[in-house]
Design a protein with these regions (language model features):
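A compositional/biophysical signature of low hydrophobicity enriched in polar/charged and small residues
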Residues: 2-91
Length: 91
């Protein structure tokens, strides 16, 4: 999940760690796990690696923090190495 702070999010950036802690708990309730988190410099302000049981659970999780108005998200689905090898092997 690629994230950028909104103007509102930048104004309250000191609260960002608290919001992240709440997001981690929210992920767990939805059977998801925030595996990694990075603050970045460049096009995106933050990157989080979310593991979810299915696309629906991931979508529900992603929409919840975004509703607060502090971040905008861009999602992408990644394939682990074993899945990558399976896909390429089937070509």
């Amino acid at each position: 999940m690629l994230m950028n702070w909104t103007d509102q999010g930048v104004k309250s950036v000191k609260d960002s760690p608290k919001r992240f802690d709440a997001a981690r708990k929210l992920a767990q309730k939805g059977a998801c796990e925030l595996r990694d988190f990075y603050m970045t410099i460049g096009k995106h302000d933050m990157i989080a690696v979310l593991e979810a049981p299915d696309d629906e659970a991931a979508a529900k999780f992603v929409l919840s923090p975004a509703r607060g108005g502090n971040i905008r998200t861009t999602t992408l689905k990644a394939f682990r190495e074993d899945a990558y090898r399976k896909v390429i092997g089937a070509l």
